[in-house]
Amino acid sequence: IAVSFAESREQILNIKEKSQNCKIISKIESVKGVENYNEIIEVSDGVMIARGDLSRAVTIEKVPVLQKKFTKIALLKKKFVIAATEMLLSMTENPYPTNAEASDVANAVFDKVDAVMLSEETAIGKYPVDSVIMMRKIIVESEKFLEEEKNLL
């Protein structure tokens, strides 16, 4: 179960109690979710960093920092992490992503997120299949680099 606008430990525990044996993914996309992240991640099975809504809740320059911080904390606590929203947003209208978007996806891979997620790109975009193919290509190249990097050291 993905809990939109997860904002407190109590909210997540209440949902867990009512949905026995379901995994809970807490979507961090509000100021309260940011403020209570540590307590939310403790009782969640994983976290989705929902960058679109998050960028409307906090100033845009904080989103990349929060993504890195939340990813690191979740992985240290052995929780899974999904980076979501606006990963390849320009592909809703264009057949190719921007360089910044490609770097954004690669950096999520380098940070060891468990998944990256497309939204508008595949839901309402003009190039849904191309978006998936491009996302996969970026992930494959990024993972290759991580393997090569191990051999360099």
Please provide the spans of the model-predicted regions.
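Non-catalytic helical/linker scaffolds that mediate oligomerization, partner binding
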Residues: 1-153
